[in-house]
Amino acid sequence: MGSINIVTPYMKIGQYLSFRNRDHFSWWHQKGPVLSQMLQACHYGVHEQYQYLTLFYAHLIPALGAYTEPSVGQKGNTLLSGAGRLELSRTFTVDDSSLRIAFEPTSFLASEKGTDPLNRVPLSRLLSVLGQLSGVSLGTDRYRTLADQLTTSDDDEEKLLNEPTLAEQLQSLPSRTQNILALELVNGFVKPELYFHPQMKALASGALVEDLLFDALRSVDSAGRLGKAIDLAKEFVQAAPTTTRPQFISYQIERSHSGAAKLFLTESAINWDQISGLWRYAQPETIQTEQNRALRVLWESLNVVEGNRGPNQFPIMMVLGLFAEEPFVRPQVAFPVVGMTEGAIARSIGRFFDNMGWKESSQSYVDGLRSYFPNEDLDQPLGKQAWVALSLFDSENPALTVFYY
């Protein structure tokens, strides 16, 4: 018998698409197949695959700007790994998995010589478009409040570009990212989350990043629902060593959502006590045992090396999820795996799944990775899997997220 050619929604849609330019063509043909394979691996229904692939083609690709192949550590890359402009992440739980797409909306005008040198325009335009789509629940009031406090204004831009000292400092920043938009794909709906990076705002205003972040969190939480969580996060930061640095926040901007935020911190002094201390912070004792086991299993599966990370090395990312209900603070720890071969990373993740008893994920992960990147040599360190993060899925049970580029 001959082989069976499986026709996917990606293939069917692609028969009828046209592209405005070569960059749009490249984004669809280079990243569309990866998204398609991941949607299938996560068991999204065929109608949902058509839905999310159409969203990618019609609304996300035009906001991705020039197509570039990921290059780890390249100056100007916008996402956490420094490995590219578009991030696909898959979150695994004991019996399920789901996808998220994250990127910095941009345009060809966002360059040093363009009319939007600090890339301030594309995000608001894209949010306006997405807010009109069926299945996308998006409220812009929180976005505006946070943007006013954490992103550059007209006056800030004028200062940063024209005052010699500030202009020189601006050039030394690793990137000019002010926002990342993440879209979680859930049961035919799209749940948006916005990330705010206030480094340029801090440079223009002279304020500390930490102060900007906490002031913004309290401002957007006008009803005080996150008050307890913000207080606990502030206490953690104040007690942390100088190697722990607040970097940015994210906020869920669903129209009907009561509001939940995350505070992201980098940690360059890597040791078990520091990381496990975060993992236990403000958690009820009744659920700490299983949490601690999951963190230890991941730590050992990745063979994390303790010690200080230098300026040219990736730190560990520690995250405090802030919620209105107990537990008010829910931790997340993200480990960089850039530099390891793709196969070694996959085997480490497989060991975690196996030790946690997540049999289906354990058996399918390596094959899934091969399907995402069928033409790559996975015995090389390619940066395709850049971060592995452990979090709490539903306030008690662990979830593992792998970030792909």
UniProtKB/Swiss-Prot annotation:
Keywords: Alkaloid metabolism, Prenyltransferase, Transferase. Its EC number is 2.5.1.-. The keyword Transmembrane helix does not apply. GO terms for biological process: alkaloid metabolic process. Pathway: Alkaloid biosynthesis. Dimethylallyl diphosphate binds at residues 195, 262, 332. GO terms for molecular function: prenyltransferase activity. Belongs to the tryptophan dimethylallyltransferase family. Prenyltransferase; part of the gene cluster that mediates the biosynthesis of paraherquamide, a fungal indole alkaloid that belongs to a family of natural products containing a characteristic bicyclo[2.2.2]diazaoctane core. The first steps in the biosynthesis of paraherquamide is the production of the beta-methyl-proline precursor from L-isoleucine. They require oxidation of a terminally hydroxylated L-isoleucine to the corresponding aldehyde by enzymes which have still to be identified. This is Prenyltransferase phqA. It comes from Penicillium fellutanum. The gene is phqA.
